[in-house]
Design a protein with these regions (language model features):
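Charge-rich, low-aromatic oligomerization/scaffolding segments with amphipathic character
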Residues: 19, 146-149, 217, 223-239, ...
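Internal insertion modules embedded within essential enzymes
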Residues: 127-130, 134-155, 159-167, 173, ...
Length: 467
């Protein structure tokens, strides 16, 4: 099925050819549809009936169910979801679990509850046969890729290995001066329980405890993967802080450093192609292919680029292409380390004093760069309140009030015009933070801050780093 043909840049015939060339599948029959508008959906339903074969298997053979996803419920625990490939599965049936991660580990257990799906709802059943998509609860040791077998037929089903994490972030308890004021769950126990609970449903996530009980290393398959987790936790009422993403390196048999490489597929209007090529070149990207699409108005670029080269780039990409570019990435392989990358060339505007931002103070600050906050917002010393136009950080007092005299009155502040602040989204904030900064995440606010809040200690740390 080829979706989104309602878009101006849609090229269904080119996509058919790419599917055949890259994947090797015959795409000549693939329906061209628009899920958004409902165009040609009837063709999809007819193709399902015509092209997809009925389930095959031996109903008299031993039970075989391959677990393809994991759900979680606080009342019943882990719920394994998979398709019955052979035999039948029944409630209270004795079964054996073939562990995908440890083939020598065989677990004997019993099916306590069995469900089939009716739309988005689970319906409890007594048994299910070949082709049924079932949910099985009561087995705490289930993992994606495991096979549930009958004891007399312990034969695991081959499973595609899930790709390993490529980047990591530090999740930590928020210790800023505003900590605990906006979140419902703020302690290290809350944070730990939530992160380890996520492992029940997200098999590509890794959570490790560190030498500090208030800090956890969380690894995932990219910035987007971890940003979804952060946003979900934020909406649930959690308050915490995260560090800048860092790449997970490997070493080869000769001890040489290897880094994760991504394939980036980019569609941009022709006038922006040069800027994109330049930026990705600075980030150690290698242009592999370039062509014209959409009747010659768009350029398609294919890059091989280190995963760390994409950290913080999506925001720049949308700015450089004025929102008209499309960027898709996929993990390729581990390759030789490409060398150092200069991530951010602009410094931060840092609040010098704690308090409430004042129009007068912000008016003076906006001459130094782009502001992230407006008047009347809580700030603290060491909090990043904007971006400078230069490479170094600048400390500034946005809580500063104008001294009143007989000829100066507070009403004169009304004549000061502030440029509207740049409000960062979660993805933009994660892109912006530098290695010496943290992102403070609460249900109501996103604040960027320096890891070391005290200006004297921060300067001393910078001197020691350069020494």
């Amino acid at each position: 099925m080829i979706n989104k043909i309602d878009l101006p840049s849609a090229q269904p015939e080119e996509v058919r050819k790419e599917i055949e060339d890259v994947i090797g599948l015959d795409a000549s029959y693939a329906p061209c549809v628009s899920a958004k508008t409902g165009l040609n959906i009837q063709d999809v339903l007819e193709a399902i009936v015509e092209k997809i074969p009925a389930p095959e298997g031996d109903p008299d053979a031993g039970t075989q169910v391959l677990i393809s996803t994991i759900d979680y419920n606080e009342y019943v625990g882990r719920i394994g979801v998979g398709k019955v490939d052979n035999g039948t599965i029944r409630v209270n049936q004795d079964v054996v679990i073939c562990n995908h991660h440890n083939p020598d580990k065989i677990i004997k257990t019993k099916v306590s509850k069995l469900y089939e799906f009716d739309g988005l709802n689970k319906v409890e059943v007594k048994e299910a046969g070949i082709g049924s998509i079932v949910a099985i609860s009561g087995i705490s040791e289930l993992h994606i890729g495991d096979t549930i077998c009958s004891p007399e037929n312990v034969v695991p089903i081959p499973f595609q290995k899930i790709s390993e994490p490529t980047i990591a972030m530090q999740f930590m308890v928020n210790d800023s001066p505003l900590a605990g004021q906006e979140g419902k769950f703020v302690t290290s126990r809350h944070l730990r329980d939530r992160l380890f609970r996520e492992l029940n449903t997200d098999v590509s996530l890794r959570v490790e405890e560190t030498d500090s009980p208030d800090r956890f290393k969380v690894s995932g398959r990219g910035e987007l993967h971890l940003s979804v987790l952060i946003e979900n936790m934020r909406r649930e009422g959690f308050e915490f802080a995260v560090s800048k993403a860092e790449v997970l390196y490997h070493t080869d048999e000769n001890g040489k450093k290897l880094e994760p490489m991504e394939l980036a597929y980019i569609d941009v209007p022709n006038e922006f192609a040069g800027a994109v090529i330049e930026k990705l070149g600075q980030r150690k990207g290698e242009l592999r292919n370039m062509g014209s699409i959409s009747g010659g108005t768009y350029t398609r670029l294919e890059f091989s680029i280190p995963a760390r080269g994409l950290i913080g780039y999506r925001g720049e990409f949308m700015t450089d292409t004025k929102g008209n570019g499309i960027l898709n990435t996929v993990f390729d392989d581990y390759g030789p380390y490409k060398g150092d990358i200069q991530y951010r060339k602009m410094g931060s505007l840092i609040a010098f004093e704690s308090g409430e931002s004042i129009t007068y103070g912000l008016y003076n600050a906006q001459e130094r760069g782009t502001l992230f906050i407006g008047p009347g917002e809580k700030v603290y010393s060491g909090m990043v309140i904007g971006q400078t136009g230069r490479s170094e950080d600048i400390e500034i007092n946005v809580c500063k009030k104008k001294q009143l005299t007989n000829t100066r009155s507070s009403s004169a502040d009304e004549a000061l015009r502030l440029t509207p602040p740049r409000i960062l989204s979660l993805e933009q904030a994660l892109d912006f933070i530098d290695t010496d900064e943290l992102l403070e995440v609460t249900p109501t606010n996103l604040r960027i801050r320096k890891k070391i809040l005290d200006p004297t200690l921060r300067k001393r740390a910078m001197i020691n780093k350069k020494a």
